Amino acid sequence: MATHPQTPTSSNAFSFISKGWREVRDSADADLRLMRDRANSFKDLATSFDRELENFFNSATPPFSVPAMRSPPPKEIEFVKSLRPKLSEIRRAYSSPDFSKKVLEKWRPRTQIRINLSAIKNAIVSAEEEEEGIVDFEKRRRRRLSFWEEWKGEGEGESRDWEPIRVLKTRLKEFEKRGSSFDAFKNSEFVEKVKSSLKSMCKEPLESKEVPPLDVPELLAYIVKQSGPFLDHLGVKRDICDKIVESLYSKCKNHQLLHSLSGEESSVLGNGNINDELDLRIASVLQSTGHRYEGGFWTDHAKHDPLDNERHVAIVTTASLPWMTGTAVNPLFRAAYLSQSAKQKVTLLVPWLCKSDQELVYPSNLTFTSPEEQEAYIRSWLEERIGFKADFKISFYPGKFSEARRSIIPAGDTSQFIPSRDADIAILEEPEHLNWYHHGKRWTDKFNHVVGIVHTNYLEYIKREKNGALQAFLVKHINNWVTRAYCHKVLRLSAATQDLPKSVICNVHGVNPKFLKIGEKIAAERELGQKAFTKGAYFLGKLVWAKGYKELIDLLAKHKADLDGFKLDVFGNGEDANEVQSAARRLDLNLNFQKGRDHADDSLHGYKVFINPSISDVLCTATAEALAMGKFVVCADHPSNEFFRSFPNCLTYRTSEDFVAKVKEALENEPYPLTPEQRYQLSWEAATQRFMEYSELDRILNKENNGEKASVDKGKLIAKSASMPNLTELVDGGLAFAHYCLTGNEFLRLCTGAIPGTRDYDKQHCKDLHLLPPLVENPIYGW
């Protein structure tokens, strides 16, 4: 097999290091030889100096006798005599045979260079690449001058008697210069890189702060805290869990928290609560051990990453126009108003029914042959009412109509109809309904943030059926199960719904702008002195018993005499139309039944009073529309009507006698005109603003912190969710996995009321939506 030549980078670097090392060694040997020669020359110089001095004294003594000099000797001779003992000492010192050895011992280089060549190999190579050159070791040799050249150059024109001292000073200056040049070399970028490389290889463990380990009360407190939602699911109140956590953690808080956290953290915790202190205590312990939580068994890491700073919102609902129901109309308006913001792109995902199901659901025998035809109908209907062209995408998923449940059930994995590149934020309209029989990818795994909006009070409907109490009990826990497993946040339109996990109460619905315009028109007519309301009372709603018809007939039958002459027009279509009309005729009630129509129809503008006795609604859209048109509304004192109580035209009753009084009051008086603030409160602009706030989408879309608290430790953030496994997420993932396993069994699906064959879509759906067969989309490998 042919071998490819290796890149020369490493070999060149090694040869460069070897060459440099040889040059350093040779340079050191040359320096030692030069110093030895200088010492010997210094010794010879001292000997010659002593010899010349003796000759000088001998020449000063005459060979013949001279008369004694009475005058004192000259000063020069006295100086020479005084200098003679010192010169003799210098001569003896320099004549000593150990002089060269002592000089070498004094001036020998003391720094021993011990470099691990293999350890700094990579650092040398990087230095070559960055500086595009090598260290020139010849510079030292170029700077080296001959001892004798300097001696001769500096000695010209001066007396040679003091030349040894002058040369000694010159040598000392030279060593100082060489020392400064060596310091510059030590501080060079190359040496710094070598030092950093050596430090990185021999790096000591990071300075770890002594953090006391967790004790048993702390562990128990944290387990109870993380198990709060699960215990709440079992019926244990959250207040009890908080008290248990506080009692367990307070025992060890004082003597361990201050040791495990820095001063800044302690000041932060001083203003916090027990839960925050416990979370930061756990985080600090995990950080001291170097642990970092990278995701659990149920976590999917392949989520959408908004690299282009553009977010995607997918709205998934359970119904579509022309079925005039709340889950068809309200999500459509939500998509239109969310698409007005440039921060996100919006996709509305609605069910597609085969033609046989369309005939059962859509009014006036209206059917569509293709999704494109139905999309055109939806957009046309919407633009007539909002007055602007909404820029959002409409997609379809397979669905089947259940006559027993009177609702549309998804067929197959609904999440697969949102591409992974757009899987960022999901809004599930009726999350419990969408996930009862959901057998597919977990929503919270595919999407970064999942918000559920509860539209329907299913428990109230189920209680009216046979064995309703038992069914309601089972459905209640199934709803808790699926909403907890598949949602990050749940919004309940009113307190009329069951208390679901992760839920808050907020009305995030508005009214069609057309109704607000009708209200403004009626108010203008009244200001001109015209009579806007020429008719009495009416009721509009789907003709099924659960929509308030039972309560209405009971009230009118009980107070038939009190409401003598009272006439009520009823508009609606539905499965129970014949039964409701038969009951009204049997009781001889003054009810005028008419076919259902749009609430904005011109024929309904003249009615002054809208009566809605329903207590099964979560938030009655018709009530909001009647208030927007400036009418009186008589409704029950019920949590579903809590949002409307602030409007002066909303008259609520508690008893049947109170109902009669409110009806008479409304018929005898004129409604109050709406203020601009009240009109805005009913609008979709205000509803969208409330939705962004309560669903936490405003912070997510603005890239703000998602609510996780952090504390500073030596300049670093300790994020609670980044360094510790979340027991709640682990439990939620287990619930989702169990739900996936159960919904994959066809027998269990049928036992719980699923439509046969809805685990996957059928051939007709493949044909209508141009889908691959389920076995091709999700193959099963085996024999």
Curated annotation (Swiss-Prot):
* Record-linked InterPro entries: DGDG1/2 (IPR044525), Glyco_trans_1 (IPR001296)
According to the UniProt entry, the coiled-coil residues are none
Q: What induces or represses expression of this protein, per its UniProt record?
A: Up-regulated in leaves by phosphate deficiency.
Transmembrane domains' residue ranges? none
Q: Per the record, what are the reactions this protein catalyses?
A: a 1,2-diacyl-3-O-(beta-D-galactosyl)-sn-glycerol + UDP-alpha-D-galactose = a 1,2-diacyl-3-O-[alpha-D-galactosyl-(1->6)-beta-D-galactosyl]-sn-glycerol + UDP + H(+)
User: Mind listing the GO molecular function terms for this protein?
Assistant: digalactosyldiacylglycerol synthase activity; UDP-galactosyltransferase activity
Role summary: Involved in the synthesis of diacylglycerol galactolipids that are specifically found in thylakoid and in nodule peribacteroid membranes. Specific for alpha-glycosidic linkages.
The protein's matches in PANTHER family, at most eight in alphabetical order, are given as:
DIGALACTOSYLDIACYLGLYCEROL SYNTHASE 1, CHLOROPLASTIC (PTHR46132:SF6), DIGALACTOSYLDIACYLGLYCEROL SYNTHASE 2, CHLOROPLASTIC (PTHR46132)
**Protein name, as recorded:** Digalactosyldiacylglycerol synthase 1, chloroplastic
- Species annotation: Glycine max (Soybean)
